[in-house]
């Protein structure tokens, strides 16, 4: 597999690391990244591993090696830049990079940029749209994927393997559902972090130190999620097992219900979904 990254930031770094750790069959890998500090970080982190694995690699500010032009149709380009910079990054690509963008397979991991928009910029419909999340940085991410109808089953499998290197993958058949994916899992880590903030602050108000409250909050979430995943039981069943009639958990849950906790979460996700759809219109 030949891989060309446009953008060498955190998500590109996570993907490269995951692919190398998974012993993926990469023949060539190049990153177009104008920031010299980012180039140096990539070089420092991955050069030795790539040499050991026999991967032809390079990091450059503007151009891809000529070898990519020879196999453009079978190469992948990963668009790993911020959505507001995507159009400019595509327009500035020249030579072999332009050949891969126009003839190869394209995986975009930018929020809010539709498949049709990318296909229009590149005159290439072989586009897969992905929405990863930040836990991919520790190989615990989850990515929603959606592909143009012209993307072959083999190419879909390759795109899935790319994103599975940093976590789990969920396919959606209708692109508007990518806005829901963005709202739920793309933005989801921020909701979890806010919840931990709230738990920690509340624990401090009840007399615990910040360190105690943070440790209790983080490990309660980690343990509860591990139990949920390993038990195979629905979250409602596990919740009921913790909740004794007239007990402390019942009192806390009743307070959450009075404050319409479930409706609050639904409203938050709807707001994120609507903003994602709005961004898709802005980036046309």
How would you describe each model-predicted region?
Residues 1-69, 76, 141, 204-206:
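NAD(P)+-binding Rossmann beta1-loop-alpha1 motif at the extreme N-terminus of oxidoreductases
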Residues 29, 39, 209-216, 238:
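Small-residue helix-packing motif on alpha-helices
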Residues 36, 40-42, 46, 63-145:
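Rossmann-like NAD(P)(H) cofactor-binding subdomain of soluble oxidoreductases
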Residues 117-126, 142-180, 192-230, 275:
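Internal alpha-helical scaffold of NAD(P)-dependent oxidoreductase catalytic cores
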Residues 177-183, 235-240:
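Short pre-catalytic strand/loop immediately N-terminal to key active-site residues, enriched for Gly-Thr
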Residues 218-284:
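NAD(P)-dependent Rossmann-like dehydrogenase/reductase catalytic/cofactor-binding core
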